[in-house]
């Protein structure tokens, strides 16, 4: 059986308020639970007008309170910018409020420009090379298993209850897969960012996995942009707004999701068209028949049975319909 989950970046459409965007996130999470989705995760992005999810832990609390069974999590917390102890306590707090429903996905991404990173850490310069140590510390705190010789031995990440959040690592290749495997935690491959290295990353994860207090067996999924419409032609039209938005993001432009009309009128250069063609490798677009076959091909290639999808189209109604069609295909 294929499981479906959602990664919500809370993309803001042009002409829409972030307030409305976040209200849409609540509605979509409630609907996705009804449709049978397994998880609903929020991304973390800073100093941008185009994405409204800056604090996934707050969105998790909101969504978990408005739903009943779907797992809710982060995709992911920018661990290099924070204290592992604080992150662990925040997610233990959420787990105490919503037992067996909380996922802690963490990433190594610096989180933006150098200035943004310094603002996040209040001027303290942190190194990405500390990520392995930070990840291990989060794992220790979540499982209350700090070694006796650890500098923080005796410290407890509260509240202490009988369950703990699931711990996942987000990554784009072999190093992150190996890191997750060696620590016995879940692995999320970002196909929607880098579609080239997934097969090898999943193979390394499976072959190198060491059972842990988090997972006894390898647990992996991949994230991908998906637009599922009635026909291939309709899906292609819906994708125009996402194409232009990704093009602008790739150029470092802080952009909200444009309308289809704006995308059609945009003066694309030959270089733009080539970039859009490359970006299409990061997504699956088409009718239900087209989408189902392509996603099944990917799950077979990656040898996983869970897909986490994003759909950053302009129109919210079209977005809902895409997610519902996906559910009808697999759930």
Curated annotation (Swiss-Prot):
Native organism taxonomy: Bacteria, Bacillati, Bacillota, Bacilli, Bacillales
NCBIfam families: oxido_grp_1
PANTHER family on file: LUCIFERASE-LIKE MONOOXYGENASE (PTHR30137:SF19)
UniProt protein name: Uncharacterized protein YceB
Family membership noted in the UniProt record: To bacterial alkanal monooxygenase alpha and beta chains.
Organism of derivation: Bacillus subtilis (strain 168)
Pfam name, any one: Bac_luciferase
InterPro entries associated with the record: Bact_Lucif_Oxidored, CmoO-like, Luciferase-like_dom, Luciferase-like_sf
Superkingdom, taxonomy of origin: Bacteria
GO molecular function: oxidoreductase activity, acting on paired donors, with incorporation or reduction of molecular oxygen
Recorded GO CC terms: cytosol
């Amino acid at each position: 059986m294929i499981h479906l989950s959602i990664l919500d970046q809370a993309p803001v459409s042009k002409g829409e308020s972030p307030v409305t965007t976040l209200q849409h996130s609540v509605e979509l999470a409630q609907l996705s639970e009804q449709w049978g989705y397994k998880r609903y995760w929020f991304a973390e992005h800073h100093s941008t007008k185009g994405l409204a999810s800056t604090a996934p832990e707050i969105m998790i609390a909101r969504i978990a309170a408005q739903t009943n069974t779907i797992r809710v999590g982060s995709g992911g917390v920018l661990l290099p910018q924070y204290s592992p102890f604080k992150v662990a306590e925040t997610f233990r707090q959420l787990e105490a409020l919503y037992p067996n429903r909380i996922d802690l996905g963490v990433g190594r991404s610096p989180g933006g420009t150098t200035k943004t990173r310094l603002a996040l850490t209040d001027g303290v310069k942190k190194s990405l090379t500390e990520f392995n140590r930070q990840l291990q510390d989060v794992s220790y705190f979540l499982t209350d298993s700090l070694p006796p010789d650890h500098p923080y031995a005796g410290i407890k990440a509260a509240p202490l209850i009988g369950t703990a959040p699931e711990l996942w690592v987000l990554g784009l290749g072999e190093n992150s897969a190996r890191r997750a495997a060696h620590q016995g935690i879940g692995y999320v491959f970002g196909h929607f960012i880098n579609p080239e290295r997934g097969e090898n990353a999943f193979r390394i994860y499976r072959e190198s996995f060491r059972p842990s207090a988090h997972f006894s067996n390898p647990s992996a999924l991949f994230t991908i942009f998906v637009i599922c419409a009635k026909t291939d032609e309709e899906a292609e039209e819906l994708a125009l707004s996402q194409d232009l938005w990704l093009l602008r993001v790739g150029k470092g432009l802080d952009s909200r999701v444009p309308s289809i009309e704006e995308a059609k009128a945009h003066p694309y250069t030959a270089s733009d068209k080539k970039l859009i063609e490359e970006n299409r490798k990061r997504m699956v677009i088409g009718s239900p028949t087209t989408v189902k076959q392509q996603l099944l091909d990917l799950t077979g290639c990656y040898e996983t049975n869970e897909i986490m999808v994003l759909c950053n189209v302009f129109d919210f109604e079209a977005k809902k319909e895409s997610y519902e069609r996906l559910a009808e295909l697999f759930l």
